[in-house]
């Protein structure tokens, strides 16, 4: 028929992508807001780090003094491939789908359309969870380990703002100076990374040590001076707002999101917190780091030619035989890039 629509055509698949709601994630959506897609498999970035030089005083008859330009460093990254897929077999489409009314009378074609939406949602959710994990790793460790089938490498962003407290200086220790630590570390980011951090994200244990500290409790209980306010409330995506410190000026959060680690020890996979319990992150609330997507390349069934697409996601489908089945796969090349070097700080505090 002239008006018959193939639900697996590229046009229809693109519409499915637009209609499927995204999984919102705190780190990716808050800190990596400069989203860019590239037509190449590699992403090149010129990094320019400024300084605090001031213009010189000169005599009117001597003339000006040259202010030499700063150099730059070009970093080249190759976004890794993420390529989950699912299989639709004919026998699945002849029977009722989960949640379908017993007497709905849905045709196999209608079931195929519904299952396509469900499959894409599953693939997209898995890909988005991986993007969030990558974004957190880039901030917490300054690296992204790319470990999978046939790949084992590490992308290193050169983070140097890493602190570790030892012995009695740890939060909860007899010589702990939590407020002094935060003041020194916010200054360090301002001086070395040229960024005003206004946010602290604490791991579970770090948060407990912070609020159990006698000096912190005394400061927050000072009725003569407004040095902070504790007003916890839950926010979307597993984030909880704890309150605000006035000196240093920081909004306090905990992020309770977890991930399923089945690659470190495949024989004993476990669920882990994205933010380690004993760590804190000091960061600006609007750093506008880059979320880069490399080009997606695949063979088009109709022409048999390689096709390159400049997009964050490619959803495609193809048929295999013996047994007959339709494959639905998603391809993406995401890479969160914290392109402002040392504009945040991470610390192991307990």
Indicate where each model-derived feature is located:
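N-terminal alpha-helical "arm" segments
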Residues: 1-43, 337-350
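Assembly/oligomerization interface modules of large self-assembling protein complexes
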Residues: 33-102
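Extended, non-catalytic scaffold segments that flank or surround catalytic motifs
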Residues: 43, 53, 152-161, 168
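Phosphate/anion-contacting hairpin/loop surfaces
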Residues: 51, 171, 175, 305, ...
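Long, contiguous amphipathic alpha-helices that act as assembly "spine/axial" helices in icosahedral shell
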Residues: 81-160, 177, 181-208, 324-331
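A surface/extracellular/periplasmic glyco- and lipid-processing/surface-interacting theme
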Residues: 165-180
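Ordered core of a single globular domain
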Residues: 179-239, 243
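Sequence/fold signature of self-assembling virion shell proteins
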Residues: 217-350
